[in-house]
Design a protein with these regions (language model features):
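Conserved PLP-enzyme active-site core in the AAT-like
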Residues: 1-120, 124, 130-133, 139-140
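Conserved glycine-rich beta-strand-loop-beta hairpin in the small C-terminal domain of fold type I
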Residues: 145-153
């Protein structure tokens, strides 16, 4: 899991994920490196597949949904693994051919369009929260001004 979630630990940077994937693939070439990418999309210049992750998945109601997508998720990475995931995440025999339902296409596309701006604004807000609460004496993670790998700000 890239994001710290509810744990008091630093989130994993894409660079760290790359080092882990490289080591895992060196020691176990057939091992599949899967990354839960929730809260991490668009925060750094690269995403985990660019540095060796075989498969990533995340939610479309968070970063990539631009805060307006009401439902959905995604998988990305090696095409054979994406196809296998699609066949397991939908009804048998449908695979990736099913597409979205509930007339969500417009909201999903608008969310993808808004996502870079929403993520950038969220990072600015999280940094402000870190600074204000640290000044008030609270422990925060990450600290204000720190490089971030996801949107999570713990206080």
């Amino acid at each position: 899991q890239r994001s710290c979630g509810y744990s008091w630990r630093p989130s994993l940077s894409v660079q760290t994920i790359g080092r882990l994937c490289e080591r895992i693939h060196r020691l176990q070439p057939d091992c599949i490196c899967f990354v839960d990418n929730c809260y991490g999309e668009l925060v750094e210049e690269q995403e985990p597949p660019a540095v060796g992750a075989d498969l990533v998945a995340g939610s479309l109601i968070k970063n990539l949904g631009g805060t307006i997508a009401p439902a959905g998720g995604y998988v990305a990475g090696r095409s054979d693994l994406v196809e296998q995931a699609c066949c397991r995440l939908t009804a048998p025999g449908i695979g990736r051919e099913g597409g979205t339902g509930f007339d969500l296409q417009r909201l999903l596309l608008q969310g993808l369009f808004l996502a870079p701006q929403m993520v950038a604004e969220s990072l600015i807000g999280a940094d402000l929260v870190a600074g204000v609460f640290a000044d008030l004496g609270f422990r925060v993670q990450p600290a204000a001004g720190a490089l971030r790998s996801d949107l999570i700000q713990a206080v």
